[in-house]
Design a protein with these regions (language model features):
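Glycine- and aromatic-enriched mobile tails/lids
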Residues: 1-185
């Protein structure tokens, strides 16, 4: 039944490939989607409609959903990072509680001008900014998927940051005078 297969695919993706991700669950998801792809070949067209034949169109779109799910799950599995839609807790770095994102701009300026010294920032801030910068060099890229006949191949393309420099985000602060959200009504 194509509708049952669609429901299973949806449940698998919603359970394992959202914002917080885990490599073991992602690997299992990739395997499960391959199973759905095999099962799709045996889907029956359970069309009882006497007008417009919606089931054949749905079966065709289900195939496309499975292929796109392969791209999403494999791309997620390959990206070991800690931010945005690729958040994996095992790769998270601890942002110092008193860190202000704008200090990263100062860090990059000092580094570019050759004026960065070990005592330019607090040690934990400097360590955080260095790790953040290394992570950008590795993962500030778009994932590009191509189909090889058996599944997706994932490659990467650098993101142009010449107009806006990326900087760390701080989710535990509001704009209003940096009052913590827990204390802000």
């Amino acid at each position: 039944n194509p509708y049952k297969l669609h429901a299973e695919l949806s449940e698998t993706m919603m359970s394992n490939v959202l914002i917080v991700r885990d490599n073991a669950r992602l690997a299992a998801t990739v395997e499960k989607i391959d199973e759905y792809d095999e099962r799709w070949k045996d889907v029956e067209c359970v069309d009882t409609s006497d007008w417009t034949n919606p089931v054949p169109s749905f079966v065709n779109q289900l195939y496309n959903m499975i292929q796109l799910s392969k791209v999403i799950a494999k791309g997620a599995l390959l990206r070991d990072e800690f931010r945005g839609a690729h958040y994996k807790p095992e790769f998270e770095i601890n942002q110092p509680s008193d860190f202000k994102p704008e200090s990263f701009l100062e860090y990059t300026k000092l580094k570019a001008d050759g004026g960065l010294k070990q005592d330019s920032f607090k040690p934990d801030h400097l360590e955080y900014m260095q790790f953040y910068e290394e992570s950008n060099e590795k993962w500030l890229k778009s994932s590009i998927a191509t189909f090889n006949g058996k599944g997706p191949d994932i490659n990467y393309e650098a993101v142009d940051t010449s107009l806006i420099q990326p900087r760390p985000r701080k989710y535990d602060w509001t704009r209003e005078r940096n009052v913590k959200k827990d204390n802000y009504l």
